[in-house]
Every structure is written in C-alpha cells, then in structure tokens.
Amino acid sequence: MYSESLSNDNYDKFTSDLFNGFDSILTENGVVIYNISYGNENPTQMWTCIADVCKNTNFTIAEAIVWKKKSALPNNTSCNKLTRICEFVFVLCRKDEYMTFNCNKQVVSTRSSGQKMYENIFNLVVAPNNDGACEINKAAYSSELCEKLLALYAPNNALVYDPFMGTGTTAVACKRMGLRYIGSEISPKQCEYANNRLKGVKTQLSLF
C-alpha cells in the first residue's frame, strides 16, 4: 500500500514491487504507461525510481514521452527554477519484449525490398492538465492524455488496469474508446466519485 510518508529508498522499492506485480498480470507484449514527476523537495526521486525498476524488475524503458500541459499554475516564485509545463510519461515493457511490444503505428509505405515504413509519431503529447477541478483529488490528469496514450499502445478490446484509479480518469478514457478496464483505489470517496462519473460517459464511435 502506498503512503505519502515513504522514504526515498522505500518509495523506490514500493515502485519496483509494483512492477514485479505487473509482470505477473501483463499480457505478452503489453506495456505499462507510467506518469511520474518530481518536486523541489526531492528532484532526483523520479530518476532513482525508474532506475530501480530497470535494475530490479523484468522491465525496461521502451519510450520516454513528454506530456506538455495546457497551463502551469501557480506562477513560479523561484529565482532559478523554470516553470514546469511538462511532465514525463514512461512506457515500460518487459526486457525480452523490447523489440516486439505492441504499438499501433500504421504502415505508410513498403520498399521494394519488403521493408515496411511506418508513420512518424513524436514522443510529445499535448493535452490538458485535467478534466476540471476536483476537490478530492488535486493530482488528476486529463482523459484526453489517457486517450492519446491508449490510442498508441492499447490493442482493440484491450483490458486496461489502473492500480491508482483515483477519480476514474483512466476508466473514462477506456469507456469512451470501447476498451475494458479494471481499477484499484483505496479511497472510498474516490471510488464513489469515479462510479458516479462513469455513469455519464458514453462510448464514442471514433477517437478523433
């Protein structure tokens, strides 16, 4: 169980334990999409955490995607730190599936040799910060971000698992896209909020 009071080393271990759990349930050539950031109180935590996963689990980094948000508030009060309008989203796959993990890139042409040429998709995603203010979760991301990432990596009819479901943003994106989903959340308030939120979400025929 995650706790805000975890030390740096314990947080790294918690994350590695989480990924070892993922290894037992993730389908062949599936990926884990993991958003993580850092704060001034611990600027190295993000890097040590991901490094620990790569060292102590069966996973490695497949992609490092930059999520550019629409706004960065509150205004910066630091004399030397830049205003952070971007966060990282790491895509991790099993080490022995690095060359075969699923990505929904489309073939745009085929050379005479038979070599397939694929569309260019850049490792930058522009999406809103969140789906609006939420009093019970200040750290929610946007369903648009989820939809864009799932469009890249989720096969048709995929089953998506979010171990920190929160207010249900991942589930909202999945429901719109016609994907199946499972979520875990220890907060009863957020579970209730997510269930009520999902009642008003309809599956859309196409993403764009």
Please tell me what each predicted stretch does.
Residues 1-193:
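Core catalytic lobe of class I
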Residues 195-208:
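S-adenosyl-L-methionine
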